Structure formats: C-alpha cells, structure tokens
Amino acid sequence: MIYNKEPLQLNSPVAFWLNFPNEERVFWVDRQSNRIVVGAKRLATVKDDEDRHNYAYVFYGDTFFDTSKDPKWSGMGHEMIAFTHYYIVENGEAFYLHAGESVSIEDIEVPHIRHDFRETSDDKGDWDRLMNAISDGIGHGEMTKVVASREVQFTSDTPFNVASILTNLVENNPNCFIFGYEKDGRTFVGASPEILVRHRGSEILSYALAGTAPKDGPNAWTKEQLLSDKKNLLNIISSVTVS
C-alpha cells in the first residue's frame, strides 16, 4: 500500500483525532521513542505479521482475558488494523500520511473541559471480601502473588468529552504511554507508565514496572543489586509465569 506524505503541523495531535468524528480511530503517544501516532478510518484488517509490512503503521487490539464477556467489549480486539489517514510526530518532524485521496485537515481547537462526576459502582462489598480472601490466602501460603482489578463506574451529568480527556492525559502524564481507541461510538482511553510487550523486528521488549527500590539519590540501587536481589528475581519469575 502506497501512502502519500505531506508536512502538517498541528497545535495538538488531538486536533487530528477531531477531524474524523464518525470514523474508527486510534491515538498513541510513545514516550520511550518520542513518537505520536494518530490513525483514522479503517483501511484494512491486517491478516498476519507478513501482511503488516504492507502498511505504514498498524494497530493491534486484544482484550487478553477470556472472561471479558461484557457487551461493551464486543467487536473490540483480536485483530490488527491499518488506517487510511495518519498523523505522525517523530524526530522533530510532523506529517500527514494518507492512502489514496487526502482530506482537508483543520487545526481544530481542542476543548478543555472539567468533568463533574461521581462513582456509581455497586460492588464495593464484593471487592472488600475479595481483598480479605487474597490477604488470607497469602498469609496461609496458598499464593505468592495476586493482581486484582475492579471495574469502577463513574457517571457525569454531561457527556464525557474524549478529546479533552486525551489532552489532559497527555499534559498530566509526561512519563506515560497515552492511548485511545474509538469504534462504534465506544472509546477506550488511558495512560500507563508500562507496556507488557513491544515487538520490533527480532526484539521483544517489556516495560513492566513494579517494586519500591529507590532509583535516584544516595540510596539508589545499582544494576548489579537489582539483578542479584533474591526478592526481585522471585517477582520476575512470578510475573513471567503469570504472563
């Protein structure tokens, strides 16, 4: 697939996102590589890793958990997607990639909205019981590591503005990966200081962060200390086993 490249400088990458309000779209800020990728309008479902090289960028989504049966996740994941339009910022350059005809891109002003919301989840009692069970299990030696998660529901009297949320995530999380994916009126957004796996050519890297060892100051741990610490090694083995 041939992509045409045009220089394009926007005040915010979220402005590109706003130019495609009714399309499937993806937003990605990579702090490690200092790269921003915004894609819009599905071009193709990528068949496999070999087919992936026919496109400038592809987005892979997966829920990972077999128990994710909630309708809100229906149709999201388990596929690689190539987009028709991309906005890229990397190596001091900003440009617009498009397969086929270009569209006029406006530098839309991104709204900054303060959302007033409240938690409306109703499972706090179940969560407390789960935490007590985990604590008892660890105390009795039945388990060594548990990663627990809970879905929390928030409700606002006004619609949540995704563009504003993305902008706030970018501005307030300078050391995180920022992501957004919108499909069929549903949007998955977030920020994380870690990614489970990065695949580049023959390299597979993991940015998995955990632990409380100091990284700065006079008490900062050295590379040798981290690699030889028994507790740290046990945690790594447990994480790899769980993965």
Regions found by a protein language model. Name each.
Residues F95-H98, R198-S243:
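Cytosolic ligand/metal-binding cores
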Residues T67-D70, V89-N91, I105, S156-D157, ...:
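Short helix/loop capping segments that flank catalytic or ligand/cofactor-binding pockets
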Residues M1-N54, V152-F160:
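Short Lys/Arg-enriched alpha/beta "domain-start" segment
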Residues R31-Q32, Y87-E93, E182-G185, S192-E203:
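Short acidic-glycine loop/turn motifs at beta-strand connectors
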Residues N22-R31, Y57-F59, T144-V146, C176-G180:
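A short, Trp-centered hydrophobic/proline-enriched beta-strand micro-motif
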Residues P111-T187, A191-I195, S238-S243:
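Active-site pocket-lining segments that scaffold enzyme catalytic pockets across diverse folds
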Residues T45-E151:
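Non-catalytic accessory segments adjacent to catalytic cores
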Residues R35, L43-A44, S102-V103, I195, ...:
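Short, surface-exposed beta-strand-loop junctions and turns on beta-sheet-rich folds
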